[in-house]
């Protein structure tokens, strides 16, 4: 039997150690054992991870050599940080690592970096330009939301054309960065609109989604304040959390029967939404799914639904009546809280659970209110 040499053994041990915990999360244990430098920046005990910077950090800061991971939210809202030097040892930049660094004007991503996390540079509004080096193989959702400076992408794993970032096959739309465009036609062949792809595109009024798209990610169109017209094709099967959240001028939506999953807050705070058709295939309505849709006066809940989530329709102050289908067994906490115009509700015998304040501030006739109290107790009215 041939045994490894000492040098081979040492290298193997180092390689194994390298892969032990290269997560971008700063764990509680790591933070408890952290080494803090003179600027209030916390590093992991072994020096491989930059865990957390003080929000008081200002001016220029140089990350220590040997750091491999810049953790999630490491420089979160360090609003006085103006310049950052990242060493060539860094391979991963975590989720929201530089989110809210509004004074940051100068940063160079070294060509050692292979992964950039969700919203890594979100709200870096003073950053005039950013270069994605050719070493980057992984961009988690849209790293550049509300970061409107110039972008240059050298990585062969992505395509950046006309201020729109795609994966190399152009099957995923990652970041739409043309902030002045009022309408956009997503190219045929795109199958996925990733998390945050169109987030905060405040001038965008209409988007055409092709039949090739099957999924709309979390926050995909969130805070597109001017978006008033969108057609979801019947190829789409899932709509992510807060996918259309805060689309204040979105007036009507038809969700096709192909959709089986609607995420939490998917249409929350769509204040102008007055017309909504839900698909027959969905089994649950998520938490906050249509919360604060103030103009929504009627909705038909399909018979396939078995549960209505917490705050699902809370604040829908124009909603006048609702019929809960026979298949529903549970209605979440504050599900219809603040539906001031709601005067009629039909709750089937199959409902076994109604959360606290589910119908708080609903103006039911007294006889209906007493009937519901006798069935479910006073807690459902807060």
Descriptions of predicted regions:
Residues 1-2, 8, 22-42, 48, ...:
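Structural signature of tandem-repeat unit edges
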Residues 72-73, 94-97, 117-120, 141-143, ...:
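Consensus positions within tandem repeat domains that build extended binding/scaffold surfaces
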């Amino acid at each position: 039997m041939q045994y490894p040499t000492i040098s081979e053994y040492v290298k193997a041990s180092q390689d194994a150690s390298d892969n032990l915990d290269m997560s971008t999360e700063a764990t509680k244990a790591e933070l408890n054992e952290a080494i803090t430098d003179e600027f209030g920046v916390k590093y992991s005990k072994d020096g491989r991870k930059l865990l957390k910077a003080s929000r008081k950090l200002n001016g220029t800061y140089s990350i220590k050599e040997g750091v491999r991971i810049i953790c999630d939210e490491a420089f979160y809202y360090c609003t006085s940080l103006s310049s950052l030097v990242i060493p060539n040892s860094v391979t991963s930049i975590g989720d929201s690592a530089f989110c809210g660094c509004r004074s940051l004007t100068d940063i160079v991503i070294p060509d050692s970096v292979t992964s950039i996390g969700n919203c890594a540079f979100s709200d870096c509004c003073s950053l005039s330009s950013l270069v994605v080096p050719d070493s980057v193989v992984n961009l988690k959702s849209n790293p550049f939301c509300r970061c409107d400076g110039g972008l240059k992408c050298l990585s062969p794993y992505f395509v950046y054309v006309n201020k729109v970032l795609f994966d190399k096959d152009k099957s995923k739309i990652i970041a739409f960065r043309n902030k002045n465009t009022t309408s956009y036609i997503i190219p045929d062949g795109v199958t996925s609109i990733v998390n945050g792809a169109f987030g905060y595109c405040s001038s965008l009024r209409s988007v055409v989604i092709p039949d090739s798209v099957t999924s709309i990610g979390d926050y995909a169109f969130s805070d597109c304040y001017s978006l008033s017209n969108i057609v979801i094709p019947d190829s789409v099967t899932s709509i992510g959390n807060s996918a259309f959240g805060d689309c204040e001028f979105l007036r009507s939506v038809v969700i096709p029967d192909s959709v089986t999953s609607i995420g939490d807050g998917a249409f929350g705070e769509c204040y102008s939404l007055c017309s909504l058709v839900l698909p027959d295939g969905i089994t649950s309505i998520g938490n906050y799914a249509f919360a604060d849709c103030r103009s929504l006066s009627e909705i038909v809940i399909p018979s396939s639904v078995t549960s209505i989530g917490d705050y699902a329709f809370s604040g829908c102050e124009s909603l006048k009546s609702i019929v809960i289908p026979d298949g529903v067994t549970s209605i979440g906490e504050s599900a219809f809280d603040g539906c001031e115009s709601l005067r009629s509700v039909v709750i089937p015998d199959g409902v076994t659970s109604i959360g606290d304040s589910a119908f708080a501030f609903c103006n039911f006739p007294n006889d209906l209110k007493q009937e519901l109290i006798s069935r479910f107790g006073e807690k459902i009215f807060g």
